[in-house]
Amino acid sequence: MTSELIPFHALPIYKESTDFVLTDEEKSVIVNGEFRKALSKQGNAISKSAEVLDDEKLVRLKTHILTVFNDYVTNHLQIENQFYLTQSWTAINHKGDAHHSHIHPNTVFSCVYYVQANSGDLQIKMPVSRIQEGYNLSYNVVQQNIFNSRTINISVRSGVIVIFPGWCEHQALPNEDDAPRIILGTNYFLTGTFGDYDNKDEITIR
């Protein structure tokens, strides 16, 4: 297992590569559900269900994803606030298909587990690079990096988990492999009390 915290745009983007693979029974639950085609022409098929991980046959997968996410919150973000799982869904890209650029509304963090992936990076995009914020200068870039680029491509393979802020615009680049690219996505929101009564900023989210 290897992990990497990617500070693109000073954001806590996390990638963990593992050898965690699904059993045939678990994978059949993922791929045999009902799917709908996205409105874009890129052919991305998304599960109709937004509670895929509620299936009892996927308890092992759910435990794995939540363990990685909770470790991310505790050991990388280093905050004590509580998050809860709001949605879980699957998406499939066949050869030549991609996942259109989008964000996840009503979400603090999003997580993608790659059930099967041999091709197609996850791309995260910002309106401008970090050093363009404020003045939006057109710099003469010698070599792109996390400071002077408005996009970052994260290479993915089967078993990889990527966590990022849900408001970040992102897309999956085309799958050039003969085998379908299969992902399971999850979203998270906060619960609990934040702020302080005396500071007049206390709020409770249930």
Show where each model-derived region lies:
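Residues in well-ordered beta-strands of folded domains
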Residues: 17, 89-91, 112, 123-125, ...
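Catalytic core of non-heme Fe(II) oxygenases with the double-stranded beta-helix
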Residues: 93-163, 190-202
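Short beta-strand His + acidic residue motifs that chelate non-heme Fe in jelly-roll/DSBH
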Residues: 99-102, 170-177
